[in-house]
Amino acid sequence: MSGTFTENFIRARRDVIALDFMHLNDIQRQAVLTTEGPLLLLAGAGSGKTTVLINRIANLIKYGRGADTDELPAYATEQDLKFLEGYAKNPAPDHAERALNLCAVEPVEPWRIIAITFTNKAADELKARLERMLGTGADDVWAITFHSASVRILRRDIDRLGFDRSFTIYDTSDSQSLMKRILKELDMDDKTYPYRTVLNYISKAKDAMISAEAFYQSADKSGDIRKRHIGRAYMEYSNRMKASNALDFDDLILFAVKLLTENPDVLDYYQRRFRYVLIDEYQDTNNLQYLLASALAGGSNDGVPPRRQANICVVGDDDQ
């Protein structure tokens, strides 16, 4: 095929696919149609970032890589090119199926897409909007929070980390109650070591992937008495959580990251499953959430070589 034919076919195909997204502005539409590789979208509040995610998912399911690839159907002819050029100008409904067949390139099964957000409310809204746009085709998309995604991953393979798959999840109240008991038993004054402060130290350590033992040893080596006492509480907290087969909210993401980075076969399973990873409100991600998203997308993560190009789209507020 000539270079001119290929270029014209690619342009016509993209024009046809764009017809489904004419309700978006030019920048939003470009973001929706750019499907391959990493993509960062920064915009202010109320600019339609979530709308872009939803339409991007719709495009992936219907057209796959069609708008963002140089590949042509092996059977493409000049007649097909003329058809697409005409359809882009006058999209007749009775020709829609032929247009779809010429434009779709490896349309994505819904279960190969994961869209992660931060709150259950936001995840539920994402699911509802996807269902309104796609119908039952949206059911298998993982529209989910970081914590819920981690729970699903851990329920399948957490035994690799020495926990039972029926692990209990401690909420904030559970964690606080346990820490209060620990501090009392260790004779740590609650005015000098408020339980919330101790838990905050532990949370920051987990986000940096610093274990209780490493935290304590670092404090002991530096001679920081306060941190050494907090390290004792951290170790006792971790031991009791393990004995109870329990994980707190930080543990969910921490252990999901550990599971993926320490078990190449588990990592490979999820990287093969999820061809596309989308993250909402990216400006709110912490270190562990970044590591989890990177691992799922196939990016380099803690020395683990990427299995493939990372098809990850993140949207964030540049004012936050």
Where are these regions (language model features)?
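ATP-hydrolysis module of ASCE/P-loop NTPase motor domains
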Residues: T35, F118, G137-V141, I158-D251, ...
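The DHp (HisKA) dimerization/phosphotransfer helix of two-component histidine kinases
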Residues: N59, K204, A208, K258-L259, ...
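Key residue(s) within conserved catalytic/signature motifs
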Residues: Q283, G303, R308
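Conserved helicase/translocase P-loop NTPase motor core
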Residues: H23, D80-F83, Y87-A99, F146-S150, ...
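Hydrophobic residues in beta-strands of the RecA-like P-loop NTPase core, especially within AAA+ ATPase
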Residues: L278-T285, G316
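P-loop NTPase Walker
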Residues: S2-D164, I169, S244, D268, ...
